[in-house]
Amino acid sequence: MSTEAEYLKQEDFLHRSNKLREIVDLGMNPYPYEFPGTTSVEDIKKEYISQPLGNSEDATNKETPKVKISGRMVLFRSMGKNAFAQILDNDQKIQVMFNRDFSSVAGLPVDAEISPIKFIEKKLDLGDILGIEGYLFFTHSGELTILVETVSLLCKSLISLPDKHAGLSDKETRYRKRWLDLIASDEVRQTFLKRSRIIKLIRHYMDAQGFIEVETPILQNVYGGAEATPFITMLNALHSEVFLRISPEISLKKILVGGTPRIYEIGKVFRNEGIDRTHNPEFTIIEAYATNIDYHSVMTYVENLVEHLVCELNDGSTVLTYTHLKQGPVSIDFKAPWIRMTMKDSIKTYGGVDVDLHGDHELRKILKECSSLPEESYMTAPRGSLIAALFDELVCDKLIAPHHITDHPVETTPLCKSLRSGDADFVERFESFCLGKELCNAYSELNDPLRQRVLLEQQQAKKALDPDSEYHPIDEEFLEALCQGLPPTGGFGIGIDRLVMILTNAASIRDVLYFPAMRRLESEKD
């Protein structure tokens, strides 16, 4: 049973609704269809901020440039015959001045009992979206201002804005009602503008490197490409159970078999797992593959891409400073090459454990001492899984500077080539880390179809013993494609949300997602 939204009962909503009715009673449309021909505030500032425009008297005489803008009114103060407001357009604000003898209100009847300046003072509210036509000038303090000739009400706001000084202090509200967060915070708007720019820069960089952007299905008959729990849904038209993809990897490799040598995809993936500071069930990823290269070349690709992004966003500098870390402000240089270290060496260097000197029983004892993991998760685990668990517990958080951690245990993935040294217990996989966060996952891709089948069948045997494990099913079409022939290939996946976190100094993944996953409110439940 649905209940009436609480805001409909609030005094401010009722007061603004009364104003709305009064505006309609004046014969005005508070929600017009269009307001064409506007110029952005950003473009106006770029063109006129350094020009000698003149003063308010020049503007009153219409001797200064005329402009037309639209935006949300976020500040208003009345000063006798004049009133001043700030208009927010995208991420830019500009001051406008209403004058009792000069400014008019579009659509206000000439015989209305209320004057234009009184209409502006009494009927408009902070949050209203206005169209402004008027003349530019500089105030005595040098502030670029528009003397309003005509103001048009483009949208009446019925809910008040957050306090301009306090902003939105409640994180729950910020994430649930991101539109308020965007209105209230310049910093939040800049973060999301930067996110958009980052994705554009990635596309431009990949295109310049000769990669072709492709699209693969989000709904899959067989999920794979990662070890994760999928979301399951039903395709009614085919009476078939399907999965939201946990990775585009398998589909992308099928395209490589078809003869396209360099491809990438930017898109959503879905993993039905936990939510924390760096994880959201729905997230954006770039996966890219190139033939005739290995994981050494991929490391170079990845660090060059990230260095390029840092330079583009940071006026050519490769150094970013982070303020939210436990150890205080830290400056990090992203200039390539990054530190490269095997997983075993990283455990020895950062964790103080030389795994080659310890048997499996000893590794389990070390895990028990240093880990909060339940014992059953590792007491019967193979050696490779123990090494990977030790890395997670002892090393990850200490990788503040950019690192490539290479040569992972074979148990961590079935989709990667073994080390060319002949050690079948480890694979040519690397993960890139920064600020204690995993940023990238990459392989020398396994292209031997017979070896691939063996590894996948081994996983299925383990899944039969542990149905709750995250091993993905065998995709026979994928194995058939590999039999057709996949050239030597290197590939990588980068979580764009985490990358944006790193590039914007964000402490949580929720700060870089417009609408992160949130628990349903009681009022939203049936």
UniProtKB/Swiss-Prot annotation:
Keywords in alphabetical order: Aminoacyl-tRNA synthetase, ATP-binding, Cytoplasm, Ligase, Magnesium, Metal-binding, Nucleotide-binding, Protein biosynthesis
EC number assigned by the record: 6.1.1.6
Catalytic activity as recorded in UniProt: tRNA(Lys) + L-lysine + ATP = L-lysyl-tRNA(Lys) + AMP + diphosphate
Single Gene Ontology BP annotation: lysyl-tRNA aminoacylation
Top class in the EC scheme: ligase
Residues at which Mg(2+) 1 binds: 431, 438
Location(s), subcellular: Cytoplasm
Sequence positions that bind Mg(2+) 2: 438
Cofactor: Mg(2+)
InterPro entries (alphabetical): Aa-tRNA-synt_II, aa-tRNA-synth_II, aa-tRNA-synth_II/BPL/LPL, Lys-tRNA-ligase_II, Lys-tRNA-ligase_II_N, Lys-tRNA-synth_II_C, NA-bd_OB-fold, NA-bd_OB_tRNA
One Gene Ontology molecular-function label: magnesium ion binding
Highest taxon of source: Bacteria
UniProt KW Mitochondrion keyword: no
Cofactor remark from the record: Binds 3 Mg(2+) ions per subunit.
Cellular component terms (Gene Ontology): cytosol
Subunit structure: Homodimer.
PANTHER family for the chain: LYSINE--TRNA LIGASE, CHLOROPLASTIC_MITOCHONDRIAL (PTHR42918:SF15), LYSYL-TRNA SYNTHETASE (PTHR42918)
Homology family: Belongs to the class-II aminoacyl-tRNA synthetase family.
Protein name according to UniProt: Lysine--tRNA ligase
